[in-house]
Amino acid sequence: MGNTSSERAALDRQGGHKTPRRDSSGGSKDGDRPKILMDSPEDADLFHSEEIKAPEKEEFLAWQHDLEVNDKAPAQARPTVFRWTGGGKEVYLSGSFNNWSKLPLTRSHNNFVAILDLPEGEHQYKFFVDGQWTHDPSEPVVTSQLGTVNNVIQVKKTDFEVFDALMVDSQKCSDVSELSSSPPGPYHQEPYISKPEERFKAPPILPPHLLQVILNKDTGISCDPALLPEPNHVMLNHLYALSIKDGVMVLSATHRYKKKYVTTLLYKPI
């Protein structure tokens, strides 16, 4: 009776509504709520949809990793070259660095190239060639548990130490005030005017060294007739012509190749 009176008093305080009792196992007298079984066919579509979205989830995590790295420490962007050598008509690049959006590549002869400024770290990417997703087997790859294969690239600071050093040197040498400049004074542009006495001058006399043509010299009896004597260095790289005989002009030139001298003859009919 004590319990009945206490329940009745509680009902009066709650407006006459009585909450359902629960047993020791947590069940309600009004009926148990439906439970989702792990192996029931009702949740098969749920797990199937999760398996389908797993690659997209992995790509999203890779993209999210790049965003977290950028938020933590804004690393310096480094020029990175992407090249596709597998042929095709239209090639696009997609990666974790651009939220897996398609970026067209520029055609260069038989290759497709793109240069992007990427922060330091690891980045995944793929190629979209003529409507098909593929990866470059000649570059490093990473494979997920579901078999998704992506190319991976490591952008390291050490790969650009030479360029950084050159940039520092160029900045140090940017001040050219200490360099020698042109002498002070006015500068003009005046055309050359030949003097009247220069017009009637005869051509200069041929230097005597060029008169000693090796083709005009007689070879000694003890020498090989196929070999010519060693020419003087002033005779090199000059064109010599023989007087025209029987309608044929003969031209010759001597060149030096290391320690050897080669004389070439050209016969031209006229």
UniProtKB/Swiss-Prot annotation:
Phosphorylated when associated with the catalytic subunit (PRKAA1 or PRKAA2). Phosphorylated by ULK1; leading to negatively regulate AMPK activity and suggesting the existence of a regulatory feedback loop between ULK1 and AMPK. The modification N6-succinyllysine is found at K201. Residues 68-163 are annotated as: Glycogen-binding domain. AMPK is a heterotrimer of an alpha catalytic subunit (PRKAA1 or PRKAA2), a beta (PRKAB1 or PRKAB2) and a gamma non-catalytic subunits (PRKAG1, PRKAG2 or PRKAG3). Interacts with FNIP1 and FNIP2. Residues 9-36 have a biased composition (Basic and acidic residues). Residues 1-44 are annotated as: Disordered. Transmembrane segments: none annotated. GO terms for molecular function: protein kinase binding. PANTHER family: 5'-AMP-ACTIVATED PROTEIN KINASE , BETA SUBUNIT (PTHR10343), 5'-AMP-ACTIVATED PROTEIN KINASE SUBUNIT BETA-1 (PTHR10343:SF84). This is 5'-AMP-activated protein kinase subunit beta-1.
